[in-house]
Amino acid sequence: MIYLDNHATTPCDPRVAEQMMPWLVEHFGNPHSTSHEMGRQAKSAIDTSLGVIASHLGIAPDSVLITSGATESNNLAIDGICRHPRQRRRHVVTSTIEHPAVLDVVARLEKDGFRVTRIPVHSNDHELAGQIDLDQLAAAVDDDTALVSVHWANNEIGVIQPMESIAEIAHRSGALFHSDATQAVGRIDVDLGRVDVDLISASAHKFYGPKGVGLLTIAGGIAGRRVRLKPILVGGGQQRNLRSGTMAPANVIAMGTALELAVTESAQVAERVSAMRSQLWNGLVQGIDGIFPNGPLHERSRRLVGNLNCRLPGIEGESWMAASSEVAFSSGSACSSVDAKPSHVLTGLGLSESEARRSVRFGIGKFNTPDQIDRAIEVLVAGYRSLTG
């Protein structure tokens, strides 16, 4: 099978798995049991990896919390800030095209009496397609806003948000700015020493690390704003009482290794992946009349280089997937693809429900090859033609 669903997950880099193995088999000490050498060894390894992670994000190591993944990180960031006992503000602002791990959290807050504003994004035919409407954002944020939460890059259409502008709008009213950076970390430059974001969420499995481990940064932006969190998990006091539970050295080491590789190899990988996306798109355009792109222009400043989202004339994406089973791709977010509803991201772009159902997403990754892309084009075009006669 040709795997073109790297926004859902990425394969674990063999070099990452190699670094994990000793900590799964040989060095199994509890990093919080430091009365003996095995525990101290595990703690030291975690501390080293936290330093690596923090350095690549432009923050201090003590500003990184280890979680089970970005879903937990988003919950901890949003709920933790809004439900802290000293939080007096009762307003949250987000975008209409966030991941469900953000939208569902703010919906729960709304049910509990918080005021939630969901800002639309520019439509598919706009020059800034997929980017949040900054004028509407500025009008919505007020002195009661506790948090603005907007993703760094979108998991379906790959749009990169104007982070500096969002940060400025959030901070001038005294709100904190959280970003679900799951699709950005390891793919593009995420430098919190340069971009004034207070908290970000990420998952290792999106940048060729293992599943089940992620992070939440709480540095408070360039200004070092105070971030008060009410913990979700209690019962051990680990990670400064903000996230209880025994940390897994193998997972933390793997995430540090994966991020190190992703950052150091980013320029080379981006060139290859961008070329393969162009190869795939050009092949599909030549083979399928009327195929149309969804989302922003294929420019690095606006869109993740490996992302391609397009819609078909005449058939639904699910049917195309079934007819092209040699290629792994998707019709939307893997975290919510069991939902019968069309993608809220695509309808948020202004597409009709029919257009959204006729859309698919490809995610090209560093382990793909041009030969795979050529074969994928053959399979995809043949699959489409088998459905349309």
Report each predicted region and the residues it spans.
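Pyridoxal 5′-phosphate
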Residues: 1-389
